[in-house]
């Protein structure tokens, strides 16, 4: 994997930094694991904007990823690594011994030809998945479930991982990258190793158009709007906003705590680092 800084042959190329991975498959994705992906433009079923800064972008297919890793006891081989436009991580096409193919997240160091397996009898090796009750304390894992059988929800983006720091009774304690310590049922599954493509954080798009290709629309500052559009809007000439920073709906921002899920508070041993 190489990080390439483009020559400044134009203003749009001057700040571009690319991450090039020559190991990725250059052809089309596996058709049997693709699904239609419709664009919403950030609108809900009534046509109103519910997510700002969304719209346009290149047409994409969704890749059906196996986040459950529940095909136990059947060895599999990594056929190839692929780019996935729907996530920061790369994905791997896996061929099981019974002929089935699935996509999984590509772990750090994973290559075509590697052998992987799921289940309690799998060895401790990058890419293998098993319940947390069978994973040694101190192990680094990714693609961790929060509810048994629901599918991975934690540590799925490029370079992400969590560490198993303790196991007591029905729960295992995980240390997340944010510093948060969280309890998860020991029957939840996780995959050994880190998510690959950690160099993704080094890339620079270099121009506004590259954001638009990805379906990301501009972000307008509140102080540049009219009073009807934002609490910071209006005024004669340039203003500072005149109040503490708030969202367009008047909720304080920049450090204001908004977490209100008391039902799951008991699973958080320590809040994330500030």
Swiss-Prot record:
Pfam families: Ribosomal_L2, Ribosomal_L2_C. Keywords: Ribonucleoprotein, Ribosomal protein, RNA-binding, rRNA-binding. Gene3D superfamilies: 2.30.30.30, Nucleic acid-binding proteins (2.40.50.140), Ribosomal protein L2, domain 3 (4.10.950.10). PROSITE patterns: RIBOSOMAL_L2. InterPro entries: NA-bd_OB-fold, Rib_uL2_dom2, Ribosomal_uL2, Ribosomal_uL2_bac/org-type, Ribosomal_uL2_C, Ribosomal_uL2_CS, Ribosomal_uL2_dom3, Ribosomal_uL2_RNA-bd_dom. GO terms for cellular component: large ribosomal subunit. One of its GO terms (biological process) is cytoplasmic translation. One of its GO terms (molecular function) is rRNA binding. Part of the 50S ribosomal subunit. Forms a bridge to the 30S subunit in the 70S ribosome. One of the primary rRNA binding proteins. Required for association of the 30S and 50S subunits to form the 70S ribosome, for tRNA binding and peptide bond formation. It has been suggested to have peptidyltransferase activity; this is somewhat controversial. Makes several contacts with the 16S rRNA in the 70S ribosome. Belongs to the universal ribosomal protein uL2 family. PANTHER family: LARGE RIBOSOMAL SUBUNIT PROTEIN UL2M (PTHR13691:SF5), RIBOSOMAL PROTEIN L2 (PTHR13691). This is Large ribosomal subunit protein uL2. It comes from Shewanella sp. (strain W3-18-1). The gene is rplB.
């Amino acid at each position: 994997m190489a990080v390439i800084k483009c020559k400044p042959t134009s203003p749009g190329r001057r700040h571009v930094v690319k991450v090039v991975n020559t190991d990725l498959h250059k052809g089309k994705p596996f058709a049997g694991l693709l699904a239609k992906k419709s664009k919403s433009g950030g609108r809900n079923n009534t046509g109103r904007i519910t997510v700002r800064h969304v719209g346009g972008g290149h047409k994409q297919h969704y890749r059906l990823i196996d986040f459950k890793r529940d095909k136990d006891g059947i060895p599999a081989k990594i056929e190839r690594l692929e780019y996935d436009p729907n996530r920061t991580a790369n994905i791997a096409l896996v061929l099981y011994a019974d002929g089935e193919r699935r996509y999984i997240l590509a772990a750090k160091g994973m290559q075509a030809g590697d052998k992987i397996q799921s289940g309690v009898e799998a060895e401790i090796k990058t890419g293998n998945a098993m319940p947390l009750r069978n994973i040694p304390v101190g192990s680094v894992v990714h693609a961790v479930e929060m509810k048994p059988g629901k599918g991975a929800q934690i540590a799925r983006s490029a370079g992400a991982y969590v560490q198993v720091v303790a196991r007591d009774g029905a729960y295992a304690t995980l240390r997340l990258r944010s510093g948060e310590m969280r309890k998860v049922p020991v029957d939840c599954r996780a995959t050994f190793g880190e998510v690959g493509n950690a160099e993704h954080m080094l890339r620079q798009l270099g121009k506004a158009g590259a954001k638009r290709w990805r379906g990301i629309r501009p972000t307008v500052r509140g102080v540049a709007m009219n009073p009807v559009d934002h609490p910071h809007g209006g005024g004669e000439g340039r203003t500072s906003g005149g109040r503490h920073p708030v969202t367009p709906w008047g909720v304080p921002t920049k450090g204001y705590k908004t977490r209100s899920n008391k039902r799951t508070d008991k699973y958080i041993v320590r809040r994330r680092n500030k």
